Amino acid sequence: MSKKYDYLVVGAGLYGAVFVHEAKEAGKSVLVIDKRPNIAGNVFTEDVEGIHVHKYGAHIFHTNNKKVWNYITRFAEFNRFTNSPVANYHGELYSLPFNMYTFNKMWGVVTPEEAAAKIEEQKKEAGIAEPKNLEEQAISLVGRDIFEKLIKGYTEKQWGRDCKDLPAFIIKRLPVRLTFDNNYFNALYQGIPVGGYTKMVANMLDGVEVRLGEDYLEKKAEYDALAEKVIYTGPIDAYFDYQMGYLEYRSVRFETELLDKSNFQGNAAVNYTDRETPWTRIIEHKWFEFGKDDEGNDLPKTVISREYSSEWKPGDEPYYPVNDEKNGALYSKYRELAQKEKKVVFGGRLGEYKYYDMDAVIASALDMCEKELG
């Protein structure tokens, strides 16, 4: 008996949406399901008073990959937003990334030579030849002042551990700019889709049946019977019923509120780098689109989200894979099981247990499409 669909795609996020579009173009029949009540996965944006709110954390598209940029701009026009976060340390405001504005505020230096000399002086003072932990690694790269004010508290909140107890490899490099360039990402292409990410993903899924609020793993046999092959973008350990144990994640909790004012902090992202403030950062969503609605009108209200890093436990929303040896070894075991599933392709952030920027997810999905669809 032939199956009703060529492909079942589990998950309507970016990875799934790329495959859906390519499969449809190749003349394949596709059914998409997602256990959430909405499409777009973690890039989902919802309209609140004309503001596109990034419900699962800020997503700023940036890439140097021309193929990916040309691909994604078929589904949305992108604005010219560039990410220039601000760091708030006990009310002192600093520019991120670390640049001449940062160094001037920190030490009163004016020229690049003075800034470079100050950083070198602090690195020499520390005298760390072989960093044994994250604290020593950061100080060996940028000196103690920047570490204490802009790295230490933020990192400890993010990881829930002291910097002395975190491995040095977490910070491989800290970009230091001896210019006044405030653009956080050194990417050729950057922006936010006009109208929000949800609209963009809807364009990718156009013309394909999508069923929301459907948990694949609860009805696996029923759904597997519908399609020749499955593209699975959920957690790989959940697919195998956690038989080897749980892969660990870091999670994030958001407190989002609508405020009856037009401007809360004057920037899309403000990082709180002291240890005492419980949140890691505040996102003010309207500034991703310059404070305007889709028609270009000024928005009278604003929406902010306070972000808190939290320890993940089974059942929580998985955000960031914990890429340590223990979890890497466990993922390898699940990967071996996955390779035996000849009718299932595992992909995306959760399916591959990998921290992916959006452009890398799209590139990975396009590579898979070439192999799968020819």
Regions found by a protein language model. Give the residues of each.
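Short, well-ordered alpha-helix to beta-strand connector turns
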Residues: 5, 27, 208, 226-228, ...
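Short catalytic/ligand-binding loop motif for oxyanion handling, primarily in non-cytosolic enzymes
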Residues: 40-42, 95-96, 147, 158-163, ...
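Glycine-rich FAD pyrophosphate-binding loop
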Residues: 21-49
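Dinucleotide-binding Rossmann-like beta1-alpha1 core, especially the glycine-rich loop
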Residues: 49-124
